Design a protein with these regions (language model features):
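Short, intrinsically disordered low-complexity segments
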Residues: 1, 28, 36, 41, ...
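A generic alpha-helix surface/boundary motif
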Residues: 9-10, 178
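A local structural micro-motif
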Residues: 24, 68-69
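Feature captures hydrophobic
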Residues: 47, 52-67, 73-90, 94-233
Length: 233
């Protein structure tokens, strides 16, 4: 049931009636990041119920923020794409993210660690440039996490396609990364660096594999600085 509006003519109030309902802003984050299919959107908001996700998408469609389209090449599959109106919200979402990055207490943000969301965020922001000349596999392990969500595999293909697996894909692993979830989340957010957390992170692989991981995931100095200002893919 939709909450009553603010009943003010102010544009901030009117926009807030749509954008500030529960889950809407993080759903927009996923849409702006490039997710268009229902299951991919769910991976970005794993704690959001499918029913509520469908409802929020319908509300955004009714407001002209997203447009539902048939997927090319997949009969019976539909996708939700941002309209021009929706694309204009990129700067709004990025501004909120940048403010949160600078102003929200680090200890508070690290209370909400989630391995599935962390790895999904890594997968969509991983930039394999230049792409490898052969398939490259990086396995991440979080020993303190229960078994079903303990290990993840990032698979980078020679043409640049990136896949995330939560079950062993059966490929040869080029680099093993083992650390606790809180540490990796802090590194990924740019709150600390791989060098500063060296005692907590175990890397097992060739120097070339380590170099690729650092470059692709932005674990170098430039990547850390970039993450201090929130940007979506």
């Amino acid at each position: 049931m939709r909450q009553p509006g603010y009943k003010q003519f102010c544009p901030v109030a009117m926009a807030s009636e749509l954008l500030c309902t529960r889950w809407t802003m993080v759903l927009l984050r996923e849409l702006i990041s490039g997710s268009t299919r229902f299951n991919d959107l769910r991976r970005g908001v794993p704690r959001m119920s499918p029913t509520l996700l469908s409802r929020r998408l319908q509300e955004l469609e009714a407001a002209g923020v997203v447009e539902r389209k048939a997927a090319k090449g997949d009969r019976g599959v539909f996708e939700d794409h941002l309209t021009e109106s929706g694309q204009e919200l990129r700067t709004v979402v990025e501004a909120i993210g940048s403010w949160g990055q600078r102003r929200i207490d680090t200890r508070q943000s690290l209370k909400n660690v989630d391995p599935a969301f962390l790895m999904w965020d890594m997968r969509r922001k991983l930039s394999p440039s230049p792409p490898p000349d052969r398939r490259t596999v990086i396995q991440f392990s979080y020993p303190e996490v229960p078994a079903p969500m303990r290990c993840y595999w990032l698979v980078v293909e020679p043409h640049g396609e990136v896949d995330l697996c939560s079950a062993d894909p059966g490929f040869e692993v080029d680099l093993y990364v083992s650390t606790d979830l809180r540490t990796m989340t802090a590194i990924w957010m740019g709150l600390t660096t791989l060098e500063q957390e060296r005692a907590k992170v175990t890397l097992s692989g060739t120097p070339e594999a380590v170099r690729k991981m650092r470059a692709w995931l932005g674990f170098n100095r430039a990547g850390v600085e970039a993450r201090r200002t929130f940007r979506l893919p």
